[in-house]
Design a protein with these regions (language model features):
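Non-catalytic accessory/interaction domains
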Residues: 2-327
């Protein structure tokens, strides 16, 4: 209201709005906070570690390469921190590290509590290990999602070992949220590209063990009245187990579902049909490729043609990938 009254029928600059908000809220440095977010590229990484009975927070620019990470840019970062079951604590992190006294130095620490901040978080190993399966149940959905997403991006940035991400992921056996599983799947898929041979076989087993509890809870058969996100979660879990986990039983069931859908499309839930197509293609051979290629060429609707084309892109064979590129 102050902003509208002051500049009624006039022209303004961006900073006029920040100044008006700052005047309304009092001592908060709104203008410097917003300027640091708008007038420089990138976004911050807030690093958290425990020293004695203190939580120490500092920042650097987040980046996937050393040149970006060494950028000296500093943001005014409003940070919400929750320690154990205590109320959230709010602070403004600038160039100097912030130290928070901890009543319980062994408590679970959640930086970016509530998930509202536009920054990534890097926990040191000691803090990361506190996110046990029990502790994860005390986090909100967005907090769990960001924990996984930040950890995987740290792996991509070569700031966290893939084994550490996998260890964190394995604590999510009680997870039933589709968005969180999407983040987990992205990381597991990426790790699968990094290993081969015996290590890849061991990774697949660990993925199957991770997915099995959640897939057991949601089941293969859609329940009456279930929501669309439950159906999407089922499809995602089946795909992760069958493709990333190499679950031969899941692969077999997907082939059976696809055969049933070919005979009677209404007999299989659309999400399971889409999943079955993905799984059969990702684990398929030349015969499967020819099947989807025929469907692509004979499709009588744009939707059916796209579905077949997407299936062709899932095949792993270098020769088949090249055939798809040459279409």
């Amino acid at each position: 209201r102050r902003y509208l009254r002051t500049h009624e029928h006039g022209n303004t600059e961006t900073s006029d709005l920040w100044d008006a908000i700052g005047a309304a809220v009092g001592d908060e440095p709104v203008r410097s906070l917003m300027d640091s977010s708008i007038w420089q590229p990138g976004f911050p990484l807030v690093r958290a570690r425990v020293e004695g009975r203190e939580l120490v927070l500092d920042q650097q620019r987040f980046g996937f390469d050393e040149a970006t990470r060494s950028d000296p840019s500093i943001w005014q970062v409003p940070v919400h921190v929750r320690v154990g079951g205590a109320a959230e604590r709010r602070l403004l992190l600038g160039a100097e590290p912030q130290r928070l006294a901890l009543d319980d130095p062994a408590a679970v620490v959640v930086v970016n509590a509530g998930g509202h901040g536009f920054y990534r978080v890097a926990y040191d190993q000691a803090l990361r290990e506190r996110f046990t399966a029990d502790a994860l149940r005390g986090l909100t959905t967005i907090e769990r999602y960001q924990l996984v997403d930040d950890a995987w991006n740290a792996v991509v940035a070569e700031q966290l070992a893939a084994a550490s991400f996998l260890g964190l992921a394995e604590r999510f056996t009680g997870e039933d949220n589709h968005a969180v599983w999407q983040a987990l799947a992205a990381g597991l898929r990426g790790i699968g590209r990094l290993v081969e041979g015996d290590a890849h076989a061991a990774l697949r087993q660990r993925i199957r063990d991770l997915v099995a509890p959640a897939l057991g809870r949601v089941g293969w058969t859609p329940a009456a009245g279930e929501g669309p996100l439950t159906a999407k979660l089922r499809g995602l879990l089946v795909s992760v187990s069958a493709v990333l986990g190499g679950d031969v039983d899941a692969q077999r069931r997907c082939r059976e579902l696809l055969a049933a859908a070919d005979t009677d499309p209404a007999s299989v839930h659309p999400e399971l049909v889409a999943t079955a197509i993905n799984v059969v293609a990702a684990t398929g051979d030349d015969t499967d490729y020819e099947r989807f290629l025929g469907q692509f060429r004979r499709a009588d609707t744009p939707q059916a043609q796209l579905r077949a084309l997407y299936a062709l892109a899932e095949f792993d064979s270098e020769v088949l990938v090249q055939r798809t590129c040459d279409l």
